C-alpha cells in the first residue's frame, strides 16, 4: 500500500514531449556562471559542506552522524574528500554509497491513511556531502533560473508570503471594482 502510493506520487509519465518543451526554454545562464558550474570540484568545497552540516542530524544506514566526521576530520578528511571528489568529478556514485533508509513520519497525531505520512530519506554522510557540495555550487545559478517574484528557492522569503501577496491582490482588485 505504501509502496504503491509513493511510487505513483514520485513518478512521472508521458514524457513524450519533453524535447519539445526543452527546445522552447531559452538559455539564461551566462557563460561566466557556467564556467564556474563545470570546473572540477575541490577539497575546500567538501570541507565547507561538512562544516555546514548540523552535527546531530539523522544518521544514515551506517548509524554515523555528521559530528563524527566533523570531530575526526583531521584524521579522516583526506580519505573522505578523496571519495567525495572522485564521485563529483567522475559523475558516478558507487551503488554502495547510494543505499538509503526511507522512514515515514506521521503528519498528524492519529495518522491512518498513507497520505498522512511524510517520507524522509536517511542517507550515508558521504552521499549527503556529495549533495551539499552540489547544492553549494548551484546556488550561484538560482538568480538566473528563479524569478524574483517567486517565493520558493529564495533564501530570504517564505512560501507563505504568497498568501499575503494573493490577499493584497484580491483586495486591490475589489477596491478597483468598487471604486
What are these regions (language model features)?
Residues 2, 9-10, 50, 105, ...:
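Residues that mediate protein self-association or partner binding, especially
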Residues 1-115, 129:
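Surface-exposed loop/turn segments and immediately adjacent short secondary-structure elements
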Residues 98-99, 143-150:
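A short alpha-helix capping/helix-loop junction motif
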Residues 12-17, 132, 136-141, 176:
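Short helix-capping/linker segments at secondary-structure and domain boundaries
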Residues 115-146, 160, 164-170:
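Conserved pre-motif C helix in the palm subdomain of viral-like polymerases
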Residues 91-93, 111, 142, 172-175:
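Beta-strand elements of modular eukaryotic interaction domains
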Residues 107-110, 165-179:
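A short acidic-Thr-Gly-centered motif at the start of a beta-strand
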Amino acid at each position: 500500500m505504501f509502496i504503491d502510493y509513493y511510487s505513483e506520487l514520485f513518478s512521472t509519465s508521458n514524457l513524450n514531449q519533453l524535447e519539445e518543451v526543452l527546445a522552447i526554454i531559452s538559455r539564461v545562464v551566462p557563460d561566466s556562471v557556467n564556467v564556474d558550474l563545470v570546473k572540477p570540484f575541490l577539497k575546500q568545497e567538501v570541507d565547507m559542506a561538512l562544516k555546514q552540516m548540523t552535527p546531530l542530524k539523522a544518521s544514515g544506514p551506517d548509524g554515523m552522524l555528521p559530528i563524527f566526521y566533523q570531530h575526526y576530520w583531521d584524521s579522516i578528511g583526506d580519505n573522505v574528500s578523496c571519495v567525495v571528489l572522485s564521485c563529483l568529478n567522475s559523475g558516478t556514485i558507487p551503488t554502495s554509497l547510494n543505499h538509503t533508509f526511507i522512514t515515514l513520519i506521521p503528519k498528524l497525531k492519529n495518522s491512518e491513511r498513507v497520505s498522512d505520512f511524510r517520507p524522509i530519506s536517511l542517507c550515508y554522510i558521504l552521499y549527503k556531502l556529495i549533495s551539499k557540495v552540489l547544492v553549494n555550487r548551484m546556488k550561484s545559478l538560482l538568480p538566473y533560473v528563479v524569478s524574483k517574484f517567486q517565493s520558493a528557492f529564495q533564501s530570504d522569503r517564505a512560501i507563505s508570503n504568497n498568501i499575503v501577496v494573493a490577499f493584497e491582490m484580491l483586495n486591490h482588485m475589489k477596491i478597483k471594482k468598487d471604486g
